[in-house]
UniProtKB/Swiss-Prot annotation:
It catalyses: an archaeal dolichyl phosphooligosaccharide + [protein]-L-asparagine = an archaeal dolichyl phosphate + a glycoprotein with the oligosaccharide chain attached by N-beta-D-glycosyl linkage to a protein L-asparagine. One of its GO terms (molecular function) is oligosaccharyl transferase activity. A glycophospholipid binds at R420, Y518. This is Dolichyl-phosphooligosaccharide-protein glycotransferase 1. Pathway: Protein modification; protein glycosylation. A motif (WWDYG motif) lies at residues 513-517. Oligosaccharyl transferase (OST) that catalyzes the initial transfer of a defined glycan (ManNAcXyl(2)GlcAMan(2)GalNAc in Pyrococcus) from the lipid carrier dolichol-monophosphate to an asparagine residue within an Asn-X-Ser/Thr consensus motif in nascent polypeptide chains, the first step in protein N-glycosylation. It comes from Pyrococcus horikoshii (strain ATCC 700860 / DSM 12428 / JCM 9974 / NBRC 100139 / OT-3). It comes from the Archaea. Belongs to the STT3 family.
Length: 976
């Protein structure tokens, strides 16, 4: 008996030693493994680092980051919304973080760009560490490990933390997770010193996170939701002492977060001041509820859970009712900015509503199977079951468990709202994936089998889970390497923008479709002011779309009011032309994206490549054939098994027109036009078949209006092309045809000889009337003007009703002749912030009605001018065409832009080349804006949608516009 007892004791000691060794190994090895995976996460995310950024918005963030390094806390960005610039709308905390990171890594030789490329992968590295710490705090070490492993290779997480994507949601989430870990330790810790440290970290990290992203209200709402639920649950279950302890610890910390966060809104480090005020009001409501909970027992029945629950329910319902009455429907629109219902936002993919296909793609392993997401659901069920069991059996509401449940629930709510939140939810999904595996490992560890069997089971489970990173990491790496070769480098944008940078004035402006505005502005590329980009002047998107998608007079936009110099056409925008056509009013909502069942959607433009006698697009399964039958030709478009006949086909060269039936072999309509060139076939929906994009992108001179194509090509002159990018110089006033009166006959000429001429000039005024203008001819040798000849005047010419002008001129001997129109027009770009009475104001809306004061401007010009300074109003609005409401599938929206001068502020201002500082006393008349708004509302009623109202400072000078340059030829006649 004694011997057997001794053996049992020895075996017990041996088991204890094995268990202690196992625990020690786990505590040491798991953190090492996590650190290794975090480094691997950094490696994967840094594979995208190259010359440029794969994400277009990051070009803008890079520019503001450089301004922060240069100026500290800048307020103004001069390159957007040309020629005015814009206030910086993003929180400066987003840029202070990588700027601080640069200060550290610059010690090791990294420059500004290299540090900026390192920053997002470093955020990814931190995110992996943060999820590990949160997982081990919520459940166990295994949870932290497997959450970190999954986050390392999560496509959803990679999508916002790869090098070249420096948006704010990445650093916000990493900081918020660290803050949450600090909060949970703070609430648990009993040691006073450590409690102060954790509490300080909680407040500090949360406040910093508020400055990282304008979506940071998510963090405040998670914390407030957690606090509200914990307060209510502890009260209902009668845990008043725990409630008092929780209130004493959490409430002051949350109040400090709101106070410090709001204080940082004044220097612009945090930009969610309105939401902080709202959160404070909700927090006051929670405090009011708390007071009733703690002190209402004197008057209310708190005898049991049912009565306490009833009291809370009534008060909460009353609170919601009061909040709804105070705030309105937007009470339920948490993060509503992510899914705003405007026509522009409808066309932005990342703001679209999330589908199950998106979830599967972003949370898939090797393919779009959504495995990571679906394995997080058992984690939710496990933790929810554990929480409810502890709550109802032990009256215990664990901070860690409740917080994790609130975090996951609110993350999934946002994931449901918009595609962009697939990233934000990646942390919660990884955490609950880890909870599922961590719980399974915990079950194995607590089994009664010997440690060898348990270890074997644990190893098998671990190997099964390790399949995820081993299988998906190579997929992610291939995607990352593909992203490194950016669209800029392979399409011609790099060469075109560097040409623009080298061959135009530093004050020149350019535009394209808004997606490319940040490339135009970037100091790495164009370094020129852009009229529209991905974050500014969103009202102008409709005007750009109107120009690109339409034809004829309606498409004539007053680009001169934007002081536009260059328009860049990207041939690949045919793939975006559904969105462009919709925003430009060319097609209806149904034609853009289909009805509720997806029916009615059209493809506006499709390209095919010439291959012998046919034109092929293998991806769309389309073949265009030119069929010769006897002496006639017909065009057949094969779509799968269908054969269709377009309404019209036009073959170039020769402008040969071939009419068709506009129907397919099954009798369905086929409302398309086909253009065939030697290398390319263009299939265009009939509503956009003559659009300006078709003209400028493919050089097809098509229009529904006589001579409009010729006019357009005179106003937009190609000056550079590389790959799929064409740079056009914009001329507001141009001559598209010159006729010379020779021997009693008008003859069109392309050259002019020295001597006397009677010329008929066909003028195209694009989007702007000619008023009190003078016509000149400059005779040039090279770039030197040898003679300036006045040839005529134009008192007024409506840009929609141009007519030819007859002039008499005697031309001297010269190499070429430049025709000039001189009339008043805008000049200058703002180079610094606009101040009214010393305060920086919005440069595109500088004064309100009835406001007056000292106006300070900085304006840059290329040469000397004498200018008058005006306040000008610009209204950009849509008028619904068709449909009974704005949500009707048959509705289309026609863009309009109206401009008018409000008042002259000062005349005779001397502007010199370079930057000029101008100070004037300004006064904005009353009712100048409101009266015009009322006029539009009266005219259009509920069909009116105002997209932008501007009050802009404009310098008006006598300005010379080049209309055409013609080469000289040898003298050969005299005019009669």
């Amino acid at each position: 008996m004694v011997k057997s007892k001794v053996k049992k004791v020895e075996k017990g000691k041996e088991g204890e030693e094995k268990r202690s060794t196992y625990v020690l190994l786990k505590k040491v090895l798991i953190p090492i493994l996590v650190f290794g995976f975090a480094i691997y996460a950094f490696y994967l995310r840094h594979l995208t680092a190259g010359k440029y950024f794969p994400d277009p918005d990051t070009f803008y963030h890079f520019e503001i980051y450089k301004l922060v390094l240069k100026e500290g806390l800048p307020r103004y960005y001069p390159m957007s919304d040309a020629p005015f610039g814009s206030l910086i709308g993003e929180p400066l905390g987003l840029y202070l973080l990588p700027a601080a990171f640069y200060k550290v890594v610059s010690l090791f030789g990294y420059n500004e760009l290299q540090a900026f490329l390192l920053w997002p992968p470093f955020v990814g590295f931190l995110g992996v560490i943060a999820v590990y710490l949160l997982g081990r705090k919520v459940l166990n070490e295994w949870t932290g490990l497997w959450g970190a492993v999954v986050l390392t290779v999560s496509t959803a997480n990679f999508s916002r933390t790869f090098s070249g994507n420096a948006r704010g949601d990445g650093p916000f989430m990493a900081l918020f997770i660290f803050a949450s870990v600090a909060m949970l330790y703070y609430l648990k810790e009993s040691n006073k010193t450590r409690k102060i440290i954790y509490g300080t970290l909680f407040v500090l990290l949360t406040v910093i996170s508020l400055g990282a992203w304008n979506g940071s209200p998510f963090g405040l709402m998670v914390l407030l939701g957690f606090a509200s639920l914990q307060t209510i649950i502890l009260f209902i279950f009668g845990k008043l002492e725990e409630l008092k302890k929780f209130v004493k610890e959490f409430y002051p910390a949350y109040l400090a977060i709101l106070a410090f966060g709001y204080a940082l809104t004044f220097p612009g480090i945090v930009k969610i001041g309105g939401f902080i005020r709202f959160a404070f009001e909700v927090f006051l409501g929670l405090i009011f509820l708390l007071v009733i909970m703690l002190y209402g027992g004197r008057y209310l029945n708190y005898s049991d859970k049912k009565h306490r629950f009833l009291v809370v329910t009534i008060i909460v319902l009353l609170g919601f009712g009061g909040a709804y009455a105070y705030v309105g429907p937007k009470l339920f629109r948490l993060m509503g900015g992510a899914y705003q219902s405007t026509q522009v936002y409808e066309t932005v993919q990342e703001l679209a509503k999330t589908t199950i296909g998106d979830v599967k793609a972003y949370y898939g392993v090797e393919s779009g199977n959504g495995l990571i997401f679906f394995l997080s659901i058992p984690g939710l069920l496990i933790l929810l079951t554990k929480y409810l069991y502890d709550l109802f059996k032990k009256a215990k509401s664990d901070n860690e468990t409740l917080f994790a449940l609130v975090f996951y629930t609110m993350s999934l709510y946002l994931l449901y709202l918009a595609v962009r939140f697939l990233f934000l939810a990646s942390y919660a999904v990884a955490l609950f994936f880890g909870i599922f595996i961590g719980f399974s490992m915990d079950v194995i560890e607590k089994m009664k089998e010997n440690i060898g069997i348990k270890a074997a089971l644990g190893i098998v489970l671990s190997l099964m889970i390790l399949v995820i990173p081993f299988v998906h990491a190579p997929v992610l790496a291939r995607s990352a390497r593909a992203l490194k070769n950016t669209e800029i480098e392979v399409t011609g944008w790099e060469q075109a923008l560097k040409w623009l940078r080298s061959n135009t004035s530093k004050y020149a402006t350019a535009t394209s479709w808004w997606d490319y505005g940040y490339w135009i502005e970037s100091s790495l590329l164009g370094n020129r002011r852009a009229s529209a980009d991905g974050g500014h002047a969103r009202d102008r998107d409709h005007i750009l779309a109107l120009f690109l998608a339409r034809d004829g007079n309606i498409s004539e936009v007053d680009f001169e009011s934007w002081e536009l110099n260059y328009f860049i056409i990207y041939l690949n925008d045919w793939a975006k032309f559904n969105a462009i056509s919709y925003l430009g009013g060319a097609i209806t909502r149904k034609e853009y994206n289909g009805d509720e069942n997806g029916r009615g959607r059209v493809t506006t433009i499709l390209l095919t490549q010439a291959a012998g006698n046919v034109y092929v697009n293998p991806y769309a399964r389309i073949v265009i054939k030119v069929i010769q039958q006897n002496k006639t030709r017909r065009i057949a478009v094969n779509i799968g098994q269908l054969e269709c006949s377009p309404i019209l086909s036009v073959a170039f060269p020769g402008n040969i027109k071939i009419k068709g039936s506009g129907r397919c072999s099954d009798g369905s309509p086929f409302p398309y036009v086909v253009y065939l060139t030697p290398s390319l076939g263009v299939l265009a929906y009939y509503k956009v078949a003559t659009s300006n994009f078709v003209k400028l992108a493919f050089g097809i001179p098509t229009s529904s209006y006589s001579e409009f194509a010729e006019k357009l090509f005179s106003n937009f002159i190609p000056v550079y092309q590389y790959g799929s990018v064409i740079v056009y110089e914009f001329r507001p006033f141009a001559i598209y045809k010159i006729e010379d009166f020779i021997n009693g006959t008008w003859r069109e000429v392309g050259k002019l000889s020295p001597g006397k001429h009677t010329l008929r000039l066909y003028i195209s005024a694009f989007g702007r009337d000619i008023k009190n203008a003078t016509l000149y001819v400059y005779a040039l040798n090279g770039t030197k003007i040898i003679k300036r000849i006045k040839v005529g005047e134009i008192k007024y010419m409506n840009h929609l009703e141009e007519y030819p002008i007859i002039v008499n001129v005697t031309l001297p001997t010269a190499q070429k002749y430049r025709f000039i129109l001189a009339q008043k027009g805008p000049v200058g770009v703002l180079t610094g912030p606009v101040r009214v009475n010393g305060k920086i104001t919005n440069p595109a809306y500088i004064m309100r009605e009835g406001e007056s004061g000292r106006l300070e401007l900085k304006v840059g010009v290329d040469k000397e001018y004498t200018a008058d300074l005006y306040l000008r109003a610009t209204f950009i609005y849509l008028v619904r065409k068709g449909g009974k409401s704005n949500e009707d599938y048959d509705a289309s929206f026609e863009p309009h832009m109206d401009t008018f001068f409000i008042t002259k502020l000062k005349e005779g201002i001397k502007l010199r080349p370079g930057e000029n500082e101008i100070v004037v006393n300004a006064e904005m008349p009353k009712n100048a804006i409101s009266s015009y708004k009322e006029k539009l509302e009266k005219e259009h009623g509920d069909k009116l949608i105002i997209r932008g109202i501007r009050v802009e400072p404009v310098f008006i000078v006598e300005k010379e516009y080049t209309m055409i340059e013609v080469s000289a030829s040898a003298p050969h006649h005299s005019s009669e």
